[in-house]
Swiss-Prot record:
<feature type="binding site">
    <location>
        <position position="238"/>
    </location>
    <ligand>
        <name>S-adenosyl-L-methionine</name>
    </ligand>
</feature>
<dbReference type="InterPro" id="IPR030390">
    <property type="entry name" value="MeTrfase_TrmA_AS"/>
</dbReference>
<dbReference type="Pfam" id="PF05958">
    <property type="entry name" value="tRNA_U5-meth_tr"/>
</dbReference>
<dbReference type="GO" id="GO:0019843">
    <property type="term" value="F:rRNA binding"/>
</dbReference>
<keyword id="KW-0489">Methyltransferase</keyword>
<feature type="binding site">
    <location>
        <position position="298"/>
    </location>
    <ligand>
        <name>S-adenosyl-L-methionine</name>
    </ligand>
</feature>
<keyword id="KW-0819">tRNA processing</keyword>
<dbReference type="InterPro" id="IPR030391">
    <property type="entry name" value="MeTrfase_TrmA_CS"/>
</dbReference>
<dbReference type="GO" id="GO:0005829">
    <property type="term" value="C:cytosol"/>
</dbReference>
<dbReference type="InterPro" id="IPR029063">
    <property type="entry name" value="SAM-dependent_MTases_sf"/>
</dbReference>
<dbReference type="InterPro" id="IPR010280">
    <property type="entry name" value="U5_MeTrfase_fam"/>
</dbReference>
<keyword id="KW-0808">Transferase</keyword>
<dbReference type="GO" id="GO:0030697">
    <property type="term" value="F:tRNA (uracil(54)-C5)-methyltransferase activity, S-adenosyl methionine-dependent"/>
</dbReference>
<comment type="function">
    <text>Dual-specificity methyltransferase that catalyzes the formation of 5-methyluridine at position 54 (m5U54) in all tRNAs, and that of position 341 (m5U341) in tmRNA (transfer-mRNA).</text>
</comment>
<feature type="active site" description="Nucleophile">
    <location>
        <position position="323"/>
    </location>
</feature>
<feature type="binding site">
    <location>
        <position position="189"/>
    </location>
    <ligand>
        <name>S-adenosyl-L-methionine</name>
    </ligand>
</feature>
<protein>
    <recommendedName>
        <fullName>tRNA/tmRNA (uracil-C(5))-methyltransferase</fullName>
        <ecNumber>2.1.1.-</ecNumber>
        <ecNumber>2.1.1.35</ecNumber>
    </recommendedName>
</protein>
């Protein structure tokens, strides 16, 4: 079955989101939102599918959210064209390979605009040397067919990486090419086109910045590195080791010399800034030397916790990207006591769903 997207209703669903966002934000008196559209199809750069076995056949499936019925997928127009191409070739390549298809229950795909793809095969069985040899042959066959592919095998407490567990993305952002290492099983922005819109919007509205930037939850440095051009220095925190390593690589790959990444949670950083705790990880970093006039936050769906919210309020400017406008509005009840919204944007990161991504820039009231 080929799932068709309701592209004819794209404008209507986007209009409804804009209306919903305006209503939610009305109590905070924001300016009119800037609206950034998604491509109509093939916009999602990563996808996960369950694998269904039926006698000698196997295929990708998804489950209908309402009926819970399984849907057989040959193509998936939500995902990038590269993922769609790989879906067909991969299943055809492993269908007759017993070692590769036996107890395979899920396939994860991560693709880039730079035409690279990482495929993770997940199993309910132990993986050994026999699997590795078959997987190496599969990878070479896929590369022979023109795919720039990395292949990973996963099972309980097992991860087999044939070459690398990452691929490098190259995004055109505000007139320059930005290199971003993307690590398997780590967070990356799913909609590359909308991610570019978010980065360029953030660059544009912080062009007049003074002093330094602090970013909490920086991931692989997606925003930190793009925004570095607008600030004297950038200090960024991240808790996940693979993301920190990717961010350090990205700093070097992009020739950026004013970004410092530290591995700690937002809560730990708050304690360090308040002098409540000392951390060995901060040796050689003088937090007091940073003059952070702007703080950037892109928190999880739960929003900012109370302690971090209090810390964030101390900064003259707050750039807040939210994947959940409800928790954003809850946080704004506190933040708008001391700040006003100077910019608002809606990013249609997840078209044809109720999910909205939005951004606000808040500036301290005089």
């Amino acid at each position: 079955m080929q799932n068709l997207l309701p592209t004819e209703s794209y404008e209507q669903q986007l209009t409804e989101k804009v209306s919903r966002l305006k209503n939610m934000m009305a109590p905070f008196q924001p300016p009119r939102p800037e609206v950034f559209r998604s491509p109509l199809s093939h916009y999602r750069m990563r996808a996960e599918f369950r694998i269904w076995h039926e006698q000698d056949d196997l295929y990708h499936i998804m489950f209908d959210q309402q009926t819970k019925q399984r849907i057989r997928l040959v193509q998936f127009p939500v995902a990038s064209k590269l993922i769609n191409k790989m879906m067909v070739v991969l299943i055809d390549s492993i269908r007759s390979e017993q070692i590769l298809c036996h107890k395979l229950f899920q396939i994860d795909y991560l693709s880039t605009c730079s035409n690279k793809i990482l495929v993770s095969l997940l199993y309910h069985k132990k993986l050994g040397e026999e699997w590795t040899q078959q997987a190496l042959r599969l990878r070479e066959a896929l590369r022979h067919k023109g795919f720039d592919v990395e292949l990973i095998g996963r099972a309980a407490k097992t991860k087999i990486t044939l070459d690398h567990d990452y691929i490098d993305e190259v995004l055109p952002v505000a007139g320059r090419k930005m290199i971003y290492r993307q690590v398997e099983n780590s967070f990356t922005q799913p909609n590359a086109s909308v991610n570019i819109h978010m980065l360029e919007w953030a660059i544009n509205i912080t062009k007049d910045s003074k002093g330094d930037l602090l970013e909490l939850y920086c991931g692989n440095g997606n925003f930190s590195l793009a925004l570095a051009q607008n600030f004297e220095r950038v200090l960024a925190t991240e808790i996940a080791k693979p993301s920190v390593a990717a961010a350090q690589y990205n700093i070097t790959a992009n020739g950026i010399d004013n970004v410092q990444i530290i591995r700690m949670s937002a809560e730990e950083f708050t304690q360090a800034m308040n002098g409540e705790r000392e951390f060995n990880r901060l040796q050689g970093i003088n937090l007091k030397s940073y003059q952070c006039e702007t703080i950037f936050v892109d928190p999880p769906r739960s929003g900012l916790d109370e302690k971090t919210l209090e810390m964030v309020r101390a900064y003259p400017r707050i750039l807040y990207i939210s994947c959940n406008p409800e928790t954003l509005c809850h946080n704004l009840e506190t933040l708008t006591q001391t700040h006003k919204i100077s910019h608002l944007a809606l990013f249609d990161q997840f078209p044809y769903t109720h999910h909205m991504e939005c951004g606000v820039l808040l500036e301290k009231l005089n």
